[in-house]
């Protein structure tokens, strides 16, 4: 049996980032576990085909509990390399500034928008966007859908 310094459970967006950062230390061994596979279905590579992901092998196919007026509501969650980020139509959405500032105001110092902005910028590669708000050298390419 192999020994690992860290075990990261879930190869979704956050799990992959955490595992990558931890593994940058040559003295650290990281195991990244994921329940699903690494296959890339059409709905994962073509934004307009995202509905193909729903109910597929890449979707845990979760649903809410029974709702009073609507029955259960589908709650798709990604199963596989990339997690829910692999089945969400390639949409990259940052929270609103007010949400982060609300966290800081509620007693979470260091979690305000201006505190987190440098972290967001380090993660993004958003060429042609406002450099005061977007990064240009990060690993996550962010931009409009090609051809739109």
Residue ranges and their predicted role:
Residues 1-148:
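N-terminal redox-cofactor-binding region of secreted/periplasmic oxidoreductases
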